[in-house]
From Swiss-Prot:
Biological or metabolic pathway of the protein: Porphyrin-containing compound metabolism; bacteriochlorophyll biosynthesis
Family: Belongs to the ChlB/BchB/BchZ family.
Subunit comment: Chlorophyllide reductase is composed of three subunits; BchX, BchY and BchZ. Forms a heterodimer of one BchY and one BchZ subunit.
GO molecular function: oxidoreductase activity, acting on iron-sulfur proteins as donors
Protein name as it appears in the record: Chlorophyllide reductase subunit Z
Origin organism lineage: Bacteria, Pseudomonadati, Pseudomonadota, Alphaproteobacteria, Rhodobacterales
Organism: Cereibacter sphaeroides (Rhodobacter sphaeroides)
Name of the coding gene: bchZ
Domain of life: Bacteria
Length: 408
């Protein structure tokens, strides 16, 4: 429809081939992501600001703000939801629920769900909510108060109180209802059979800064679960994936959250002793489809769902401790020559202790037993009369010497 504005998003190669030609007599404008010198978050930030400046502003001037009718609810924009960001559908659904729960209404969701002809209506909101800290530039341009979408119980409560203060609303009735409704399962999960492991079940997370900071703050700050490491993927910088692989090998967190990269690094550890850590998708890239609205991470509903996933991950870890029947049948018989009084050198025992310390507390007993039997069998097979340090280090695999030095 030539009467409606339209945008064609092109890439560098298409621009070189097409020469930037725009059909005459159309309202098509071109937006070129700088695919060579910026990442997807920088491109998203620039695209959102460009769309508003091109289709919302008039010659660089802000459009006039429509006065809110007497008695109408305060209005809020939600900025950031778009294809290609992790868990967007569920988190958007939860943020909308929070906004409407305290008595406000959503003015616009930008860019997903917004039309180019509606860009000038962005200024009609009384406040803005930025869902992802990686691209918040449009909130600065709009000039209204804005808040970061929350993750965790305490953060959500603080968010609602601040939003209520900005909009002139009382969020306390909604906050008081949450423990008896949305947050009620948190109590059940916290008192479940996995409660014995919360104090020792460490976790690691590698995700965009929005999720890495928020999830760590919730699990470690609100709930007290020990965090082995948290690596944030930030706009404008490249993640050191080799360092991430090293952190996973060094700490062996019982629960690992991340992208397909971290899932691959986790698979590399399967040859080791002890149970396998559980993986929870928390970032792109990865083959994780999250189009349903039942898997939030943000808000009160996100606090409930996230704790549920951690509990399920702990059950998975317990499952891996148990040997499968087929594995027991196919395993080699225990050598009768193994003796509990088989002599060990002191440095060999120290090396074994260092390996066991890499395992979560929950799984150390089974890991220590398996490693000790494997070391003694290797020594007997080699015709040795005692277990030496080199035998233990050989069980750990390549690179153990470097990690051993780090732990000393």
């Amino acid at each position: 429809d030539p009467a409606l504005p339209a945008v064609v998003v092109t890439g560098s190669i298409a621009e070189m081939i097409g020469g930037g030609v725009t059909p005459q007599g159309t309202n098509i404008q071109r937006f070129l992501p700088r695919t060579i010198d910026e990442d997807q978050w920088e491109a998203a930030d620039r695209a959102m600001t460009w769309i508003f400046s091109e289709f919302g502003m008039t010659k660089g001037r802000m459009p006039p703000e429509a006065k809110r009718p007497e008695g109408a609810k305060p209005r809020v924009n939600i900025l950031g939801p778009m294809y290609g960001v992790f868990n967007m559908a569920s988190d958007l659904h939860e943020i909308r629920r929070l906004v409407e729960g305290i008595g406000a209404e959503v003015n616009m969701v930008m860019p997903l769900g917004a039309h180019l002809a509606e860009m000038r209506h962005l200024v009609n909101a009384d406040a803005n909510i930025v869902m992802y800290r990686e691209f918040a530039g449009l909130a600065e341009v709009l000039g209204k108060p804005y808040l970061q979408a929350p993750i965790g119980v305490e953060s959500t409560t603080a968010f609602l109180r601040r939003l209520g203060e900005i909009l002139g609303l009382d969020p306390e009735p909604f906050i008081e209802r949450a423990p008896h409704s949305t947050l009620k399962p948190v109590w059940d999960l916290w008192r479940s059979v996995t409660q014995d492991f919360f104090g020792t079940a460490n976790f690691g997370i590698v995700a965009t800064e929005t999720y890495a900071r928020g999830i760590r703050n919730y699990l470690e700050g609100d709930l007290g679960l020990p965090c082995a490491f948290a690596v944030a993927r930030k706009r404008g910088s490249k993640t050191d994936n080799e360092a991430v692989r090293g952190l996973i090998r060094q700490h062996r967190p019982l629960v690992l959250m991340g992208s397909i990269n971290e899932k691959i690094y986790l698979a590399e550890l399967k040859a080791g002793h002890g149970p396998q850590p559980s993986f929870i998708a928390a970032s792109f890239p990865g083959a994780a489809i999250r189009r349903a609205t039942g898997t939030p991470v943000m808000g009160y509903a996100g606090a409930t769902w996230l704790l549920q996933e951690v509990c399920n991950a702990l059950f998975d870890a317990l499952f891996h401790i148990l040997p499968l029947g087929t594995q027991m049948d196919s395993a080699a018989a225990t050598p009768t020559t193994l003796r509990r009084d088989f002599p060990w050198d002191a440095d060999a025992q120290a090396a074994l202790d260092r390996i066991v310390e890499e395992h979560p507390v929950l799984t150390r007993i089974s890991a220590a037993r398996a490693l000790r039997d494997a070391a003694e069998k290797a020594a007997l097979d080699a015709g040795a009369e005692r277990v030496v340090r080199e035998t233990v280090e050989a069980l750990r695999g390549p690179g153990f010497g470097e990690r051993k030095g780090e732990n000393q």
